[in-house]
Amino acid sequence: MTANVGINGFGRIGRLVLRIALSRDDINVIAINDPFIAPDYAAYMFKYDSTHGKFKGTVTHEGKYLVINGKKIEVFQERDPANIPWGKEGVDYVLDSTGVFTTIEGAQKHIDAGAKKVIITAPSKDAPMFVVGVNHEEYTPDIKILSNASCTTNCLAPLAKVINDTYGIEEGLMTTIHSITATQKTVDGPSHKDWRGGRTASGNIIPSSTGAAKAVGKVLPALAGKLTGMSMRVPTTDVSVVDLTVNLKKPTTYEDICATMKKAAEGPLAGILGYTDEAVVSSDFLTDSRSSVFDAKAGILLTPTFVKLVSWYDNEYGYSTRVVDLLQHVAKVSA
């Protein structure tokens, strides 16, 4: 059964979600809404991408439509989601990638406009969060508004799940070394809630807060209250890396941890969790569709119960792939 989809917000995630969705036979993207992007500009932004390269296909625009490989996708420019004619256009599922409507109250506007389900492509304070490969099978059809959590939670959760299932986690601290995102500044500018966040993105390492580690406790209740973390924003355009330092319940060796991660990556979490023992750097993971790639050569064990683990993720492309995976799962369960 084909899922009829609308995308609200045509930024980094919205455009990559569309690229990925177009490759799936059971997804039909009908419309896009972005108050700041007209159809001609949407075509340009979709066609050319400084990070992931030029779109391999034809991209044009005709009037109010974005035309990709001959397929017409209507472009709306409504500021208020309640005014987007999702119902009239036959859209059942909305992917909200604005970063603005992240609560149930905000996302409800899409339902009011005729959509049946909304997936928020950001963490949410009150909508249930799902991470593919970790807790997505707990989704039930009565849930109309849900969150795909954050890119960092999608990297950390599969890693933490495997470690906790095998050795048990007493407690842990996470640091994500995170690439620049659109909210940062090209030169020093005002940022009243986060003063450091207002400093030049391309010339600084910027400590920042993140709820990604605590959010793991929402998708893995066994780890609630056991993980927290922070972020270091660094001057790279894409690909980030999680550094997870944990106290384990069960003593082990680093070699055994690597074997456990490799087994999980080749088994139940294939395509979501990856494994590498090569001398890789961040750019080697550009446009990698996996949520998390465990780096066997980067971690270190101090004692049999105290270990630092490292896992890479394309915070744009890997995350966008999971958004589409979650959409497919929701559509299948809801059919």
Curated annotation (Swiss-Prot):
UniProt cross-references to SUPFAM superfamilies, sorted A to Z: Glyceraldehyde-3-phosphate dehydrogenase-like, C-terminal domain, NAD(P)-binding Rossmann-fold domains
Catalytic activity: D-glyceraldehyde 3-phosphate + phosphate + NAD(+) = (2R)-3-phospho-glyceroyl phosphate + NADH + H(+)
Binding site for NAD(+): 12-13, 34, 79, 315
GO molecular function: glyceraldehyde-3-phosphate dehydrogenase (NAD+) (phosphorylating) activity; NAD binding; NADP binding
InterPro entries: GlycerAld/Erythrose_P_DH, GlycerAld_3-P_DH_AS, GlycerAld_3-P_DH_cat, GlycerAld_3-P_DH_NAD(P)-bd, Glyceraldehyde-3-P_DH_1, NAD(P)-bd_dom_sf
Record has Phosphoprotein as a keyword: no
PROSITE patterns: GAPDH
Binding residues for D-glyceraldehyde 3-phosphate: 150-152, 181, 210-211, 233
Pathway the protein contributes to: Carbohydrate degradation; glycolysis; pyruvate from D-glyceraldehyde 3-phosphate: step 1/5
EC numbers, comma separated: 1.2.1.12
UniProt GO cellular component terms: cytosol
Localisation per UniProt entry: Cytoplasm
Marked site (Activates thiol group during catalysis) residue numbers: 178
UniProt keywords, alphabetically: Cytoplasm, Glycolysis, NAD, Oxidoreductase
GO biological process: glucose metabolic process; glycolytic process
Complex and partners: Homotetramer.
Family stated for the protein in its record: Belongs to the glyceraldehyde-3-phosphate dehydrogenase family.
The protein, known as: Glyceraldehyde-3-phosphate dehydrogenase
Gene that produces this protein: GPD
